[in-house]
């Protein structure tokens, strides 16, 4: 990157954090190019002279990664390699005043929902007509669709409402327009994301309207899979399950972070649901949508978690046998309700408990995968790597779930295509198979 005072603006967008941040960066990329500005995402070239860093501020590790990235580009600026640095996203939303004071080399800081303000720095205007033209940074056959911004939930451990604000649903017509635009470019899978999918519509339609959104997206020609991520258990709209069972292009998959298996801990976490009601909901979901893959996450070591609470979490995971599960150690975050509670559990103990949960899940996953041997699944192939074509079934999200491996030695499939794969071997988190007609 070589800075020249009168050089034409060339922008590199750097994204940290979750898929919701990725969508924000894709929207910025689309708007910049739509205004005639040269822009790339995660550019490996050295010809950009302006960098926009879209930060994450969710937990300590994410905050540190964001800070390290900003400092790296500040060093580049001080060495004359770039002209301007703009910082956006959750970290600058949360700590804008502190960052302006500590990082004067950054030209401007923006919060999580300030796309028009960022564009003004480039003398560009927000063009609503580009809503259906979003440029993707993922492989073109799948795309994340953010159906809402912000969150109204009061979870004790989470600072998202501080960083992202109140829940705001995206109008259904805009989401359908996005889906049609993506389908026209060859996108086959839509992954619906939000801080809380199940709240969709309450603000603009005065009712939970996820089921109607699913129907409308399901009708878009060319979309083979629609996947739900980040559903909230309390107040889950059961009519979503009816649509999922009826529509063949809605994946039999749900990502529902449950966070714990102890009623006492769920109360401390302010989740609005206890263990018995959670168990009833899981049973209802599995009864209404046979064969559904249930993904969840758990938080380990929240203030107040006793050994008894942790034992209850272990028994909960063992009894429910989730198809996919992630476990994360509690991070003591400012601007959260639980920050006022003493973080008494040592990090080492949190990590030991986390390892115990993941060991339990590893055994469950191995048993569930073993039962898939001999079955044939429709697989969407994402990439070729290390002598294998690697794809996913409808029961798996990109990057976080199981993968299906097919040897590239004597078989071929085009990336982004579907193929039927017969499973002939299984590991804890991977399946191995061969393409069949």
UniProtKB/Swiss-Prot annotation:
Family matches, as Pfam families: Radical_SAM, TRAM_2, UPF0004
Keywords: 4Fe-4S, Cytoplasm, Iron, Iron-sulfur, Metal-binding, S-adenosyl-L-methionine, Transferase
Residues that bind [4Fe-4S] cluster 2: 151, 155, 158
Catalytic activity of the protein: L-aspartate(89)-[ribosomal protein uS12]-hydrogen + (sulfur carrier)-SH + AH2 + 2 S-adenosyl-L-methionine = 3-methylsulfanyl-L-aspartate(89)-[ribosomal protein uS12]-hydrogen + (sulfur carrier)-H + 5'-deoxyadenosine + L-methionine + A + S-adenosyl-L-homocysteine + 2 H(+)
S-adenosyl-L-methionine is among the record's keywords: yes
Domain TRAM: 370-437
Cofactors: [4Fe-4S] cluster
GO cellular component terms attached to this protein's record: cytosol
Top-rank lineage group of the source organism: Bacteria
SUPFAM superfamilies: Radical SAM enzymes
InterPro entries assigned: Elp3/MiaA/NifB-like_rSAM, Methylthiotransferase, Methylthiotransferase_CS, Methylthiotransferase_N, Methylthiotransferase_N_sf, NA-bd_OB-fold, Ribosomal_uS12_MeSTrfase_RimO, rSAM
Subcellular location: Cytoplasm
Membrane-crossing segments per the record: none
PROSITE patterns, per database record: MTTASE_N, MTTASE_RADICAL, RADICAL_SAM, TRAM
All copies of domain Radical SAM core, residue ranges: 137-367
Cofactor comment: Binds 2 [4Fe-4S] clusters. One cluster is coordinated with 3 cysteines and an exchangeable S-adenosyl-L-methionine.
CDD domains, alphabetized: Radical_SAM
EC numbers on record: 2.8.4.4
Chief site of localization: cytoplasm
Family recorded in the similarity comment: Belongs to the methylthiotransferase family. RimO subfamily.
Physiological role: Catalyzes the methylthiolation of an aspartic acid residue of ribosomal protein uS12.
Protein name, as recorded: Ribosomal protein uS12 methylthiotransferase RimO
Lineage: Bacteria, Pseudomonadati, Bacteroidota, Cytophagia, Cytophagales
Gene that this polypeptide is encoded by: rimO
């Amino acid at each position: 990157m070589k800075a020249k005072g009168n050089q034409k603006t060339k922008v590199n967008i750097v994204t940290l954090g979750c898929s919701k941040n990725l969508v924000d960066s894709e929207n910025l990329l689309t708007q910049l190019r739509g205004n005639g500005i040269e822009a790339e995402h995660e550019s490996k070239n050295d010809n950009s002279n302006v960098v926009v860093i879209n930060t994450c501020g969710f937990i300590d590790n994410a905050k540190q990664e964001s800070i390290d990235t900003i400092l790296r580009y500040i060093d580049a600026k001080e060495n004359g390699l770039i002209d301007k640095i703009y910082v956006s996203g959750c970290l600058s939303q949360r700590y804008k005043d502190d960052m302006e004071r500590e990082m004067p080399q950054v030209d401007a800081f923006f919060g999580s929902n300030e796309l028009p303000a960022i564009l003004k720095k480039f003398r560009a205007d927000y063009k609503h007509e580009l809503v259906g033209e979003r440029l993707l940074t993922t492989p073109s056959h799948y795309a994340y669709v953010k159906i809402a911004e912000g969150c109204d939930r009061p979870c004790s451990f989470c600072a998202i409402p501080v960083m992202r604000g109140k829940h705001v649903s995206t109008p259904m017509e805009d989401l359908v327009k996005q889906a049609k635009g993506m389908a026209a470019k060859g996108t086959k899978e839509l992954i619906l994301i939000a801080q809380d999918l199940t709240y969709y519509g309450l603000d603009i339609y005065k009712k939970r309207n996820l089921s109607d959104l699913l129907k409308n997206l399901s009708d878009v020609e060319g979309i083979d899979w629609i996947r739900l991520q980040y559903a909230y258990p309390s107040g889950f709209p059961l009519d979503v399950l009816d649509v999922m069972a009826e529509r063949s292009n809605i994946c039999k998959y749900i990502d529902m972070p449950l966070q714990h298996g102890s009623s006492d801990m769920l109360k401390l976490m302010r989740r609005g649901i206890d263990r018995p009601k959670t168990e009833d909901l899981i049973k209802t979901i599995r009864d209404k949508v046979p064969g559904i893959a249930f993904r969840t996450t758990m938080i380990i070591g929240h203030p107040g978690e006793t050994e008894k609470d942790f034992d209850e979490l272990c028994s909960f995971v063992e009894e429910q046998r989730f198809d996919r599960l992630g476990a994360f150690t509690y991070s003591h975050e400012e601007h959260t309700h639980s920050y006022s509670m003493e973080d008494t559990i040592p990090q080492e103990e949190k990590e030991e408990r986390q390892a115990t949960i993941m060991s339990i899940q590893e055994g469950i996953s191995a048993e569930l995968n073993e039962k898939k041997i001999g079955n044939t699944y429709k697989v969407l192939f994402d990439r070729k790597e290390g002598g294998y074509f690697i794809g996913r079934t409808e029961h798996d999200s990109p990057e976080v779930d199981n993968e299906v491996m097919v040897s590239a030695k004597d078989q071929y499939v085009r990336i982004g295509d579907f193929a039927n794969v017969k499973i002939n071997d299984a590991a804890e988190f991977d399946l191995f198979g061969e393409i069949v007609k």
